[in-house]
Amino acid sequence: MAPKDFFPPAPLDLDWDNIGIKVREVNGHVECAYNVATESWSEPQVVKGIDLTISGLSPALNYGQQAYEGMKAFRDPQGQIHIFRPEVHAARMAHSCEVVSIPPIPQVQFIRSVALAVSVNAEFVPPFDSSAALYIRPLAFGSGPQINLAQPEEYTFCVFVLPVTSLLGTKPVDALIMEEFDRTAPMGSGNAKVGGNYAPVLRWAAKARARGYGIPLHLDSKTRTEIDEFSAAGFIGVRDDDGKTTIVVPDSSCIIQSVTSDSCVQLARSYGWSVEVRPIKYTELPEFSEVLAVGTAAVIVPIGSITRDSLRDLIVYKPSEDGGYPCADKLFKSIKDIQRGLGKDVFNWCVPVHEPGAYFQPVSA
């Protein structure tokens, strides 16, 4: 049976372009457990609902021993469902797990579990012509109950899914540089996707929003002279060198290795643009013709301005005469066309999803 014959059409009773990021019930999620004795993860199981049973004494809740990912699945015009760049997300998840002492999930198991979660929730994958996608949230954590600060006897790996639209939308947003808070320490865990890097940002992001800024921007915490990343997205600067386009990406050991940023780099090179991956000085910001916030949730969002209070700096990035940002628009269209099957996947980024039986076993209650 061909995948497009198995998967049901997306529900017609949802306003796909306006569903936002509200959590809603889906068919279920996937769980795996780690066996310390065999040093292996169990086969993925489908569990109904979106709730977990977890000990109040788990190191995940008490000491923050958890790591997660963010990725998406899409439907193409033929009805085929596929996941965008799961191998890269698997590698990043493995790195994050190692940082917080969780046994890494093997790539094959990670992709099987993710694909199974998408497959059993196939009707929640939006139509190809909507602005929505199926967001995928893999999560690993120490789950065995204990009070001492040591490796637990139990670990859990889960995959949740949720239909969403873009987190930041597609219009330009204004950024505020964080000067009273450092996102990460120079030799810390900033390059891992773990909750401890995000929860402390919440109150600062709320303060920025209250002042009308859509996203915080972080400088390096050691010297505060270089660009690291936005609080929920990677940073890309665009420079116009006498008609030749160059994109500049931060090279820092304290930032997440953005899958979307890497996709932009590969696309830029295919366009014939120059690419520089290096430390970016704060003083370079006025030299850019565009600045982009890039990430799985945000996709590609142009930055309208960057404010730094202590220096009373306001750096504005003006749109073109037609109101757009040419490089952001070009990259956005290329990525979205590949994701939705409207453009040729020359990089082999999209992995098709098949019926649940291809990934394995019965549903548990």
UniProtKB/Swiss-Prot annotation:
<protein>
    <recommendedName>
        <fullName>Aminotransferase poxL</fullName>
        <ecNumber>2.6.1.-</ecNumber>
    </recommendedName>
</protein>
<dbReference type="InterPro" id="IPR005786">
    <property type="entry name" value="B_amino_transII"/>
</dbReference>
<dbReference type="Pfam" id="PF01063">
    <property type="entry name" value="Aminotran_4"/>
</dbReference>
<comment type="function">
    <text>Aminotransferase; part of the gene cluster that mediates the biosynthesis of oxaleimides, cytotoxic compounds containing an unusual disubstituted succinimide moiety. The first step of the pathway is provided by the HR-PKS poxF that serves in a new mode of collaborative biosynthesis with the PKS-NRPS poxE, by providing the olefin containing amino acid substrate via the synthesis of an ACP-bound dec-4-enoate.</text>
</comment>
<feature type="binding site">
    <location>
        <position position="229"/>
    </location>
    <ligand>
        <name>pyridoxal 5'-phosphate</name>
    </ligand>
</feature>
<dbReference type="InterPro" id="IPR036038">
    <property type="entry name" value="Aminotransferase-like"/>
</dbReference>
<dbReference type="InterPro" id="IPR033939">
    <property type="entry name" value="BCAT_family"/>
</dbReference>
<comment type="similarity">
    <text>Belongs to the class-IV pyridoxal-phosphate-dependent aminotransferase family.</text>
</comment>
<dbReference type="InterPro" id="IPR043132">
    <property type="entry name" value="BCAT-like_C"/>
</dbReference>
<keyword id="KW-0808">Transferase</keyword>
<feature type="binding site">
    <location>
        <position position="92"/>
    </location>
    <ligand>
        <name>pyridoxal 5'-phosphate</name>
    </ligand>
</feature>
<dbReference type="InterPro" id="IPR043131">
    <property type="entry name" value="BCAT-like_N"/>
</dbReference>
<keyword id="KW-0663">Pyridoxal phosphate</keyword>
<dbReference type="InterPro" id="IPR001544">
    <property type="entry name" value="Aminotrans_IV"/>
</dbReference>
<feature type="modified residue" description="N6-(pyridoxal phosphate)lysine">
    <location>
        <position position="193"/>
    </location>
</feature>
<dbReference type="GO" id="GO:0009081">
    <property type="term" value="P:branched-chain amino acid metabolic process"/>
</dbReference>
<keyword id="KW-0032">Aminotransferase</keyword>
<dbReference type="GO" id="GO:0004084">
    <property type="term" value="F:branched-chain-amino-acid transaminase activity"/>
</dbReference>
<comment type="pathway">
    <text>Secondary metabolite biosynthesis.</text>
</comment>
